[in-house]
């Protein structure tokens, strides 16, 4: 009995330190948010660049630290709905690797919608980024795009954030 308890304790200790495997991200679904845009003359259109990091370098350039990314798309208006028209995800080399929002979606006042890039999805690399096209009625309150990168491995943890910048083209 004593041997059995000792073995059980050893197994529990060893497995509790094991890193949990991240599941593959589910397809990003927005069909319940798809909408037709109001007339173009009632909207201001814009574009925002958001830097993210699928991984960062640790010790040297061949050793990386994988990160989970949460992209937050925030409507900061208290009264007007905003529209996300399109979103593209690019890797470090600038290659488009994924497309989000194939049809316009709405974000209600003070609402946030999110995209999660799983920790084991390193396709974007250390210089990944998004470009979002959007439309708003209230020119004073453009959407806010933020990303939070996080990893907790063993006893180490790292987290940081980035904020989108409007681009004009």
Language model features by range: what are they?
Residues 13-16:
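C-terminal motif of bacterial Sec signal peptides marking the signal peptidase cleavage site
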Residues 21-29, 121-169:
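Terminal connector regions
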Residues 25-47:
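Post-signal peptide N-terminal segment of mature Sec-exported envelope proteins
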Residues 56-64:
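Short, solvent-exposed beta-strand/turn "edge" segments of beta-rich domains on protein surfaces
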Residues 64-70:
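Short, solvent-exposed loop/turn segments enriched in Ser/Thr/Gly
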Residues 73-80:
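Asparagine-centered strand-capping/turn motif at beta-strand->loop junctions
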Residues 80-87, 99, 142-146:
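Short, hydrophobic/aromatic beta-strand segments
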Residues 92-127:
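Intrinsically disordered, low-complexity Pro/Gly/Ser/Thr-rich segments with frequent PxxP/GP/PP motifs
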């Amino acid at each position: 009995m004593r041997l059995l308890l000792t073995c059980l304790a050893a197994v529990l200790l060893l497995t509790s330190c094991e890193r949990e495997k991240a599941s593959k991200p589910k397809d990003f679904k927005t069909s319940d948010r798809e909408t037709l845009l109001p007339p173009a003359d009632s909207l201001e259109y814009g574009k925002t660049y958001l830097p993210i990091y699928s991984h960062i370098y640790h010790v040297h350039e061949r050793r990386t630290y994988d990160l989970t990314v949460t992209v937050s798309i925030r409507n900061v208006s208290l009264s007007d709905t905003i529209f996300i028209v399109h979103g593209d995800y690019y890797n470090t080399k600038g290659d488009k690797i994924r497309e989000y929002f194939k049809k316009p979606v709405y974000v209600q006042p003070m609402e946030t919608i999110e995209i999660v890039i799983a920790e084991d999805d390193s396709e974007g690399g250390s210089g990944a980024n998004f470009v979002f096209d959007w439309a708003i009625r209230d020119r004073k309150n453009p959407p806010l795009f933020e990303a939070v990168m996080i990893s907790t491995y063993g006893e180490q943890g790292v987290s940081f954030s980035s904020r989108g910048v409007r681009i004009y083209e």
